[in-house]
A protein has these predicted regions:
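Nucleotide-activated donor-dependent transferases that construct or modify glycoconjugates
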Residues: 1-7, 88-92
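N-terminal start-of-chain detector that recognizes signal peptides
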Residues: 2-3, 57-60, 119
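N-terminal [4Fe-4S]-dependent radical SAM core
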Residues: 3-7, 45-47, 56, 177, ...
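Conserved phosphate-interacting/catalytic interface
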Residues: 11
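Glycine-rich beta-alpha loop elements in corrinoid/cobalamin-binding modules
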Residues: 14, 18-22, 31-40, 61-191
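Aromatic-Pro/Gly-enriched surface loop or interdomain linker
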Residues: 25
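N-terminal beta-loop-helix "entrance" segment that forms/cooperates
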Residues: 38-54
Length: 191
């Protein structure tokens, strides 16, 4: 999931790097981009232009906002794909950087009230690296946080998961991966 709320068309490098390495290693990947949902996104260009921060342009002529309900669309995507994992990174499209600290929350807000079946939630980014216990305290449905660079760690998680047969063995194999944090029986673990 790209949990972007700014409604601007900057492509995140993590999307290509994460999906590329997973696909190259025979994992199925689906993508959900929240950037241009009218009921979710903030039109940051319009906001900044109205407040005289940006010069008026015709940027909006090139943007088409999705008028569907973002939560219904995401739920439909999850129901159709039936993912073992749902991953989002907290890296922002916002040039000034403050979006990185809210994107982890944005991703969680998109998912927390959906029916996720057996999907495990994984996120990464600055907050996952620097405030792991705080994240688990505020976002209890997250299963795993990846600290630091996440492409290879995410790949190892998926590879370990696929090697095992039953869900308990799958989870045990994930818990051995270096660079993750997780909660188990109300105890915090960090590898």
């Amino acid at each position: 999931i790209n949990p972007n709320k700014w409604g601007r068309g900057i492509t995140h490098i993590w999307i290509a790097s994460h999906s590329g390495i997973l696909k190259r290693n025979n994992h199925k990947v689906e993508f959900f981009d929240s950037s241009f949902y009218q009921d979710w996104s903030v039109n940051e260009i319009k906001f900044q232009t109205d407040n005289k921060m940006y010069k008026k342009t015709n940027y909006d002529d090139f943007i088409k906002f999705n008028r569907n309900n973002i939560f219904k669309d995401l739920q439909n995507k999850i129901n159709k794909f039936k993912p073992d994992f749902i991953f989002w990174s907290a890296i922002s499209s916002h040039i000034h950087g403050e979006g990185e600290y809210v994107n982890i929350q944005n991703g969680y807000d998109l998912l927390k009230n959906l029916e996720l079946k057996n999907s495990l939630l994984i996120t990464a980014g600055l907050q996952a690296t620097s405030a792991t216990q705080i994240i688990f305290g505020k976002m209890s449905k997250i299963d795993y946080l990846i600290r630091g660079e996440s492409e290879l760690v995410l790949l190892e998680i998926l590879n370990n998961f696929d090697r095992e047969k039953n869900i308990e063995d799958k989870k045990k194999s994930i818990e051995k991966v270096k660079g993750i944090s997780f909660m188990k029986k109300n105890n915090f673990f960090q590898n």
